[in-house]
Each structure stands twice: as C-alpha cells, then as structure tokens.
A protein has these predicted regions:
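Non-catalytic terminal and connector segments of soluble metabolic enzymes
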Residues: 2-162
Length: 162
C-alpha cells in the first residue's frame, strides 16, 4: 500500500537490546512486542560496544559517578541494534519501553515486566526524533536499511493516516 498522506508521521527510531536482556534470553520477547504492536524492523544487527562508542553514545553521562557501571554493563556482552519504523515510532517505542527504572516502570511496559534495575534495564530507546536520527547514523550505514511492504500495513493504520 502506498503512502498517500503527505503529513504522514512515519519515523524510524533506534532500540538497543542490552547485554542483560541477551543474558536473560529476553531478546526475542522484547523484539516480538514491537512487531506485534505494528512497528516494522527496517535494520537489525548484533554489535559489541567499545569504550569509544560507549562514550560517544552516552556522552551526556560521561563524568557521572555511575558512568563506569554503564560502560561495564554495555561492554559485558553483545547488544542487538534495531531500527524500527512506524507512525510516531519514537513516542510509541518510548511508551512501550517504560520508565528508566525498572522498579518504577508500569506493568505492561518492557521494563515494567522484565527488570528491577535502573541500569540493567533491558533496553535503550531513542528519546526524541532528533536523537533517533543521530543514533541511527551512529550505528547503521545507509545500506543497512531495508524498505519493504508488509501485508499487515493496511490493517495497522486508517487510510487517512498513511
């Protein structure tokens, strides 16, 4: 189905399924939630953080007393990088992710259902459209993205939304 609406708010956003999720065998469950919601996977790969890439991605936290814990956690095992696409994808994914602290996250969100920690919190999700674009460029090259039609698309949105 072709998009007809010039005002369609189709966006891409980044999700990082963190090492703690992989260690707990939750990666498939986490990814499945986004697919079931109707978000489309347009890029996906496993990745191992380096000190440099961790400092770049978490630049706003470098210098904080807890940064070394984040760095250690993110480098402990591979992560899964996922680019998701959908209308208002950034906001939708953030809502599905839940509060940063697993103890405060609402039941029904990824963090609310799967974690108790503030730092070992299963998933990273871009917090704005601008950051999503920047983060996607940080981890993916243009050729990593795939455009494809899905037969479910007409059932996910009303005709005037697309």
């Amino acid at each position: 189905m072709q998009r007809k609406n010039a005002n369609c708010r189709m966006e891409k956003t980044l999700v990082i399924i963190k090492p703690c999720a992989l260690q707990r065998a939750l990666a498939g469950e986490v990814l499945s939630r986004f697919e079931k919601k109707g978000l489309k996977i347009v890029a996906l790969k496993m990745y191992r953080f380096t000190k440099e890439k961790c400092a770049e991605h978490y630049a706003h936290l470098v210098g904080k007393s807890f940064y070394h814990i984040i760095e250690s956690s993110m480098m402990a095992a591979p992560v899964i990088l996922v680019a998701l696409e959908g209308i208002d994808a950034v906001e939708v994914v953030r809502e599905m992710t839940g509060s940063t602290s697993g103890r405060k996250a609402l039941s029904g969100t990824v963090r609310g259902d799967y974690c108790m920690s503030h730092q070992e919190n299963i998933i990273h999700a871009s917090d704005s459209k601008e950051n999503a674009e920047k983060e996607l460029r940080r981890f993916f090259d243009e050729q990593d993205f795939f455009e494809y039609d899905t037969p479910l698309f007409p059932y996910l949105y009303a005709e005037d939304e697309i």
